[in-house]
Amino acid sequence: MKITAKDIARWAELREAQGSLPRLVRRLAMQSGTITQLAFPAGESVSLPGWDGEILSSDGDAWVPKGKSCWELSVEANPTTKANRDYDKRTNKTPETVRRSTTLVIVTARRWSKKNAWRDEKLALCEWHSIRAYDADDLEAWLETVQKLNFLKTNTYRRY
């Protein structure tokens, strides 16, 4: 069964997506094979303070940056507004010395037509080592690269 960006965006409208998106991204990230540390609360733990996810990867790949990356995830309807809010909050709360060696990754389960322009605008500020922005289309592509993920067979990620 192919899960499309349209399916993911529809799923983002459901309350369950808020707690399940981190689980999806965590499981996808774990497939990279280069992760040495991973903290990605999911389910009821999404309400805990702190980053939505933190990863340390020895080599990185197309989806998981090499080195330290800090992740913010969202199912909110306006990805740009949420990304700006997360960017400002995390830039203000994270010491510059940490930001200089950390990639900020913003993920939305919505389609986000302005994600590349947003990313380029934020990269130009030179406040983080690097910045990545992923949307439902990227999640679809990432899912396609993964051979076997048993959780895709569960009802949690059924087509909508």
Where are these predicted regions, by residue range?
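Mixed-charge (Asp/Glu-Lys/Arg
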Residues: 1-160
